[in-house]
Amino acid sequence: ALEVMSRFAANPKWLIYLPPTMSPCETSHEPGLLEHPTEAFAYYRYEGIEQVVCEEKHMGSRAVVIICRSEDVARQRFGVTGEGIGICYTRTGRRFFDDAALEAELLSRIRAALDVRGFWQTFSTDWVCLDCELMPWSVKAQALLLHQYAAVGAASRSALGEAVNLLEQAQAAGQDVDELLIKFRTQKQLTGQYVEAYRHYCWPVHSVADLKLAPFHILATQDEVHVNKGHAWHMDTLAQLCQADSELLLATPYKVVNVNDTSSLEEGIAWWHELTGRGGEGMVVKPSDFIARGRSGLVQPAVKCRGSEYLRIIYGPEYDLPENLERLRQRGLGRKRSLALREFALGIEGLERFVRSEPLRRVHECVFGVLALESEPVDPRL
């Protein structure tokens, strides 16, 4: 963690928080599905949590945004000079943008929205730390898209297209290749779905006008870490902020579900089907309280429930064939969930220390701890 920070991180004076990883819900036994909301709701019901907040999951990149009211505030509170009014950094503490002008314009737009909504006066603060998702996915994952997903898609479509053509010719010539042709046609179709799945989350970025930022947590302001407020409060408060610049800021749709009420559960499941049916990644299910305790102690701060087409990007074009799905259902979540809880606790503790004006080294004990945990081996598909 220390090596990564020393070689790649942004100015460490900005790094007061790193977000935790997130576990998926338990594996579903619904036909043809690996993940389904039923398991997410069942987890929280088992833990004694009655009400959950379901938020649309954006397919972008996690971003922590710190905005100061002025450069003087950045100097006085963060000890940073000559770097503008804030920063946008990744979940591993690296600067999100290589283009400093693009970052500066993004931060300026967010500050203007905060000005318009009277945020500084409402919260009696001169700075804010926001937890966000920045879209498109391709703005940060361009190399991954080109060298992993697009390369696989292009090679597969080319090879399978040629194979299907040859098999069709063989069939026309009277060869017994019917089963083989069906198999390769299925593979070709699934590869096409794979390509369409990742294309949905990519578009060119030439300026800040091509970006969308979806803030979902007000993490901290001058004298407070806002973990004492429920997720619905965060959603509603940030939705008001997003109205001040709807071209850049995206309010996250959400739905409150009572996990003990059948009709409420059905509405939550139907909403998930609606989100994934139009190409969305899925949803994140959280207990209504920011910090919640259940039968086993601290419960997962969030679990993700992803749609079948998005999972095609993660597990490969043919993941949902019956023989593959049965194998994938054996995945284990224990390690991922343990990491999520520890990283969540460290993240909040780091913010609390910063708000209490403890020395930066004390804040960085928590920040570096999160980064160290993230270096532990765990299935990256979870």
Task: Write out the residue ranges for each language-model feature.
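Nucleic-acid 5′ end/cap handling module spanning
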Residues: 34-90, 182-382
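Short, hydrophobic/amphipathic alpha-helical patches that form generic packing surfaces
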Residues: 3, 131-137, 214-223
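Low-complexity, highly charged intrinsically disordered N-terminal segments
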Residues: 1-39
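Conserved loop->alpha-helix
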Residues: 80-136
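Non-catalytic, alpha-helical, charged scaffold/linker segments
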Residues: 114-210
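Short acidic, glycine/serine/threonine-rich loops at helix termini
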Residues: 66-69, 100-101, 141-147, 295-296
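Short acidic, S/G/P-rich loop/turn micro-motifs used as interaction or catalytic elements
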Residues: 95, 135-139, 290-292, 320-321
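Short linear interaction motifs
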Residues: 31-50, 107-123, 138, 264-266
